[in-house]
């Protein structure tokens, strides 16, 4: 075993070779030294365990191939582009909404230049970074003003911290939601320093329940969109319009966490109906919060629209600065919102809406091409079929609704396991992410952004 240890080169010897000098030129001295030390440590452990040299130390060329490979991997960004074939268009784990071309160009432009982020070009003095988008949102929603933060949970936190600290917030028991990552509405309220007052029951809440709970310490009445679940059967709830009327009568503000935040009626495209921001504003809700990267189809942001005097108080709260968005997000959001000024072109310009409205005929064509490519690459190892599928919007939007789709399914036919194929899919330069269902891999075309790129990726199999 001692002889094996002696065969290992020193770090200095590796660095002084021509290959070592090339590595230093490409990756830098510090990174190369660290990788060499790591490799040698692992080699010593391997020798102790197996009483032989690892393969990559069998000759110098293989050693340098291994070092180069590790250094390349270290330099790669770990957030990788993937092919979404899960059938969930707004997949939280895969980054939710794809940015439009307009949003990408706007973001790239502000990355490369100094911009008028907080500067009024007409007046020649400082302005507020939310101003551009606030004007646009008012035009689109009918609200008086708007406030932008980094996500919808932050929007809810800011509203609670600004108006309800040390006070009571009345909410229906059926709306005490938990979203992904065990993040709960009651927890946000606790962080904001307000007191939760639950009214009604899980399945039935009436207007009188809110009325009876109002006290002099009530900050506001709150509605929360139950985006990731539905209560069915013997149910009753109070609409925002009814609640707003009660709020005006009792001089208590009403706020709504709308969650997904649609700016258009999706039913016009044959999709499930979702409440729009405009509807809530028109119903008299004082503040409406929603996400920028769900049904809106843009960047991750929390958007609050509503009455000007309340928005001004949100903007003045110290927490707003901690939650504000940078120039890239604001540019991407503005560009996304401007697409809504021409709604007739939305299905062409907005990737989320394009994916959700793709005709089945096109999905079938894409499925046939995908099936042919898989069959040519997998050499009859699996049973590959085209089947009808049921896709979903995702990110908590209409959780019980499904959208007709088409999928390529892969089932075992030989001794090659699906788990092995799934692992191979994930090792590709742009990994393929499908779903396992009924003993098959389902590759759902509804959520796929680029068929040509996928087919090229499959050539690596």
Swiss-Prot record:
Pathway listed for it is: Aminoacyl-tRNA biosynthesis; selenocysteinyl-tRNA(Sec) biosynthesis; selenocysteinyl-tRNA(Sec) from L-seryl-tRNA(Sec) (bacterial route): step 1/1
Q: Give one GO biological process term.
A: selenocysteine incorporation
Localization of this protein: Cytoplasm
InterPro entries under this entry?
PyrdxlP-dep_Trfase (IPR015424), PyrdxlP-dep_Trfase_major (IPR015421), SelA-like (IPR018319), SelA_trans (IPR004534), SelA_trans_N_dom (IPR025862)
How is this protein annotated for GO cellular component?
Answer: cytoplasm
Per its Swiss-Prot or TrEMBL entry, what cofactor is needed?
pyridoxal 5'-phosphate
Which keywords does this chain's UniProt record carry?
Answer: Cytoplasm, Protein biosynthesis, Pyridoxal phosphate, Selenium, Transferase
* Catalytic activity of the protein: L-seryl-tRNA(Sec) + selenophosphate + H(+) = L-selenocysteinyl-tRNA(Sec) + phosphate
Q: Which superkingdom does the taxonomy of this entry point to?
A: Bacteria
Q: N6-(pyridoxal phosphate)lysine: which positions carry it?
A: 294
SUPFAM superfamilies given for it? PLP-dependent transferases
An MF annotation (GO) of this entry: L-seryl-tRNA(Sec) selenium transferase activity
Determine if Cytoplasm is one of this entry's keywords. Answer: yes
Q: What is its EC number?
A: 2.9.1.1
Instruction: Fetch the Pfam families from UniProt.
Output: Se-cys_synth_N, SelA
Does the record bear GTP-binding in its keywords? no
In the record, the note on similarity to other proteins reads:
Belongs to the SelA family.
PANTHER family for this protein: L-SERYL-TRNA(SEC) SELENIUM TRANSFERASE
Q: Which NCBIfam families match?
A: selA
Function in brief:
Converts seryl-tRNA(Sec) to selenocysteinyl-tRNA(Sec) required for selenoprotein biosynthesis.
- Its recorded name reads L-seryl-tRNA(Sec) selenium transferase
Q: Which organism is it from?
A: Haemophilus influenzae (strain 86-028NP)
Give the taxonomic lineage as stored in the record. Bacteria, Pseudomonadati, Pseudomonadota, Gammaproteobacteria, Pasteurellales
